[in-house]
């Protein structure tokens, strides 16, 4: 004998049957209307589309630091498919890499390298320019601002490429052999003693509240002359005696043609403003701010047009390896498909991305699925691996960790036009 079914139970069973029937109808309708080919649906497929299908391994690596060692978390590069040689790239004319050694002069090495490439692009004779000449006068101008601002100005070895350009406009340039900054038979740059003395002098000046600019700059120049030598007032060029500014004019470089770009949400896009990093010690507001896709596209576009590009990058990263000459973003940081304006800005505002090095981009390589960039680098890490003086940056590294670039205005004419249209 079957138990009697109540009216409520009967209605409940009827509801279940109707729900199942509706589910079947929706399932077959979706199958009939949906695409017939296999598509990137679901978490796993979406992960592949976003470059996260293969996870990078994180390992601890011992690195030399002074007389000792430190342990740092780095990416395991053994399985990385990467370029092995600059010959794999479409290369633009540039002079061989030069080491900056124990100095903070990367900003000047990168800018000088760009201008040397520009001379070659313009059909001028190959010319090695002096980095130390520009650095000398940068120290003078840093001291001048420190005095004028009553000590409220950054004192560091770093600077930005547009500051190097400003110093050349102000003081001119000379050739490398005309001013090496190397005394007493030295062959490697070392500014450690120079910078210590420079900083101590200015900090003592601040403590004494002595703001006599003329006296301070005379003392600063004496310190610079002691460590680097006195820069020449005139140089001999083919039998003619020229000042550094006259020599700059003779090169045919218009330094007003070089423009700098950033990509940050703290400024309205397609406007100019300040690049908010300590190395922009003079608070320049000459930076063009553009959306990230335009920013990244402008760098590759410039290279394709034959213009090299100076980059300001964060190199203190687990995906940056001198031993393998590469810069990439590992998946344990962020899958590359998720790199966007917000993730870039987030790392900048919390200090995870810092502007700690300037390099010179001199080529590119497009090979599915990646684009790689050939980087001429003056820092010591670029001399640890099999390829001396170069790095290979993958596009994701450029997108997330390159915070500023500078190039010739003709390389980015279309982008500059957007600024004219918005004003």
Q: Each predicted region: which residue ranges?
A:
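Bacterial N-terminal signal peptides that target proteins for export
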Residues: 9-20
